[in-house]
Design a protein with these regions (language model features):
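Short acidic/glycine- and proline-prone juxtamembrane loop motifs at membrane-interface regions
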Residues: 66, 72-79
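Alpha-helical transmembrane segments of multi-pass integral membrane proteins
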Residues: 26-33, 57, 76, 113-117, ...
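Transmembrane-helix motifs of polytopic, lipid-linked glycan transferases
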Residues: 28-48, 52, 86-90
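Perimembrane helix-loop-helix junctions
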Residues: 93-104, 126-163
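Membrane-embedded alpha-helical segments of multi-pass membrane proteins
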Residues: 28-36, 63, 78-86, 127-128, ...
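Specific aromatic-rich, kink-prone transmembrane helix
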Residues: 40, 79-99, 112
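Short hydrophobic/aromatic helix or loop-helix immediately within or flanking a transmembrane segment
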Residues: 2-19, 31-32
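Short helix- or helix-capping micro-motifs
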Residues: 57-62, 69, 85, 89, ...
Length: 168
């Protein structure tokens, strides 16, 4: 009901090809996804602050016993947390270029949100974050520009593109 089958579907062919035992392969893949979450945390911290901030963010995440313990054993929450943090990272990174997002950035945001949504239904909240980010930037841009129709059209095109990519 609350969990998507993406991670299990991803693991099935890997477990068929791996020479390791089924559970060992699943734990190894889960740990790799957890490592990607740590990398995403570093990048988000570096994007919001400095490389030192990113390093401290990643270090604090690694030193959190619950995250570290679940990294090897939780095939639902760790992939969701990883894809969620990647989504937040790409959303924050995209705030700098929100009206002029490149196709690559639209794909990155859409894929990250789509993976979070495919892992757990809680990923739907990322669409609300996207809407809040667009709304706040829209209000900020209205102070400097007198062409709200141009801004709304750009936001709608980007938002529909991100939604379509995430849906696929």
């Amino acid at each position: 009901l609350f969990y998507g089958g993406f991670f299990d579907a991803l693991l099935y062919p890997i477990t068929q090809l791996s020479p390791l035992l089924l559970h060992d392969t699943r734990h190894l893949c889960n740990a790799f996804i957890g490592l990607l979450g740590i990398v995403a945390t570093y990048r988000l911290g570096a994007c919001l602050g400095s490389p030192t901030t990113g390093l401290l963010s990643a270090l604090f995440l690694v030193l959190t016993p619950r995250f570290f313990g679940h990294t090897f054993n939780n095939p639902k929450d760790i992939p969701f947390a990883t894809f969620y943090i990647w989504s937040i990272y790409y959303l924050v990174q995209g705030l700098k270029f929100l009206l002029t997002l490149s196709k690559k950035q639209i794909w990155q945001i859409g894929i990250a949100i789509g993976l979070a949504l495919a892992t757990r239904v809680g990923g739907v909240i990322l669409f609300f974050y996207l809407g809040i980010f667009y709304g706040l930037v829209y209000l900020w841009m209205l102070q400097d520009r007198d062409r709200p129709a141009h801004i709304i059209r750009g936001f709608l095109i980007q938002g529909i593109g991100i939604f379509a990519i995430a849906y696929i």
